[in-house]
UniProtKB/Swiss-Prot annotation:
Protein known as: Protein FAM107B
Superkingdom: Eukaryota
Record keywords, A-Z: Acetylation, Coiled coil
Biased composition annotated in UniProt, kind: Basic and acidic residues: 52-79
Family membership: Belongs to the FAM107 family.
Biased composition (Acidic residues): 1-12
Gene: FAM107B
Residues recorded as bearing N6-acetyllysine in the entry: 50
Pfam families for the chain: DUF1151
Coiled coil: 61-108
Residue numbers spanned by region Disordered: 1-79, 99-131
Length: 131
């Protein structure tokens, strides 16, 4: 291979080319990642080689952890939120009781209806006997 002619010259005025620095190779994070991938490849733990069942199990575990965190966040409600929930429940109970009372007033019990029917039939029988 032919060497460039500026190597032979000892001319101080010439700017000698330097090899460019690869920012990816100098990055510490990238080096660590590359090293970890190589180690995993040697051990046979490459991410693309995982069986489908193992991937599904890992996804389920992640989902379960996320769900548990959400539940814990809901359990850690402030005093204000707890008090508001109590008031809301009380209001709902009062509303249900009012609805029940209205239904009872609008729809009398069955025995009251039967008693009214008996009176009417008794009166009708008495009227037919008189006539």
């Amino acid at each position: 291979m032919a060497e460039p002619d500026y190597i032979d010259d000892d001319n101080p005025e010439l700017i000698r080319p330097q090899k460019l620095v690869n920012p990816v190779k100098t990055s510490r994070n990238h080096q660590d990642l590359h090293r970890e991938l190589l180690m995993n490849q040697k051990r046979g733990l490459a991410p693309q080689n995982k069986p489908e069942l193992q991937k599904v199990m890992e996804k389920r575990k992640r989902d379960q952890v996320i769900k548990q965190k959400e539940e814990e966040a809901q359990k850690k409600k402030s005093d204000l939120e707890i008090e508001l929930l109590k008031r809301q429940q009380k209001l709902e109970q009062l509303e249900l009781e009012k609805q029940k009372l209205q239904e009872e007033q609008e729809n009398p019990p069955e025995f009251v209806k039967v008693k009214g029917n008996l009176r009417r039939t008794g009166q009708e029988v008495a009227q037919t006997q008189e006539s």
